[in-house]
């Protein structure tokens, strides 16, 4: 992950203090505080999003490292979404329908939605899962085993146990290069937001010139 992307983005935000002036009281809300929070947390996690920090071993230490890797991606992605909503003034999120990153899906879903499943099973709440694991329209309850490498086809895996006696466990595999690609694609979206900031700043300055 290129640390220069967030550095350039922060420089663009802080240029001439115009983003501060525009967003510290926008439609009755202090969006400047959200912008600062998002930038700060991207700074915190970006260097941890590196496959050198994870291991394919089947032990507790590797499980914690993968958990940290996934949660750092999640924090970065949530921050980018917040920035997108503010600067584009929309409730939508980027890459909503993209499906090209995760090539080993257990069920069909967008990359954004499938990452939520990965986050839940490997990090956020593995003992309380409710998702479309078998591809059916109706969600089902599952409970993840410990995560580890070497017991399925992926770099890292969990077994998903069902609460139904007649249903077998499923394997959910993840591949570190796919997770990194997911992260890099969304992190690079900061460049698109930067372009929007430049346009907004020009509009703001032109509006004052016309007064």
Regions found by a protein language model. Give the residues of each.
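Generic structural signal for short, solvent-exposed loop/turn connectors between secondary structure elements
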Residues: 1-2, 54-57, 85, 109-110
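Acidic, Ser/Thr/Gly/Pro-rich intrinsically disordered interaction regions
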Residues: 1-37, 98-211
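Extended aliphatic helical segments
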Residues: 13, 19, 44-46, 54, ...
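Short, contiguous, well-structured surface segments enriched in hydrophobic/aromatic residues
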Residues: 24-53, 63-92
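Short linear interaction motifs
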Residues: 54-60, 91, 95-104
């Amino acid at each position: 992950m290129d640390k220069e992307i967030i550095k350039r983005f922060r420089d663009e935000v802080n240029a001439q203090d115009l983003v501060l002036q525009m967003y510290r009281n926008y439609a009755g809300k202090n969006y400047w505080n959200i912008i600062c929070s998002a930038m700060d947390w991207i700074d915190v996690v970006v260097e941890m999003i590196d496959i050198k920090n994870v291991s394919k071993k089947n032990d507790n230490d590797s499980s914690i490292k993968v958990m940290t890797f996934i949660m750092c991606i999640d924090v970065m992605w949530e921050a980018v979404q917040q920035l997108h909503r503010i600067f584009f003034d929309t409730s939508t999120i980027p890459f909503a329908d993209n499906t090209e990153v995760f090539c080993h899906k257990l069920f069909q879903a967008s990359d954004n939605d499938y990452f939520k499943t990965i986050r839940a099973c490997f990090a956020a709440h593995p003992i309380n899962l409710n998702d479309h694991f078998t591809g059916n329209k109706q969600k089902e309850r599952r409970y993840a085993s410990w995560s580890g490498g070497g017991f399925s086809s992926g770099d890292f895996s969990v077994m998903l146990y069902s609460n139904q006696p007649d249903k077998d466990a499923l394997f959910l595999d993840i591949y570190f290069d796919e997770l990194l690609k997911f992260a890099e694609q969304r992190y690079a979206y900061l460049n698109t937001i930067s372009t929007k900031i430049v346009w907004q700043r020009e509009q703001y300055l032109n509006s004052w010139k016309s007064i």
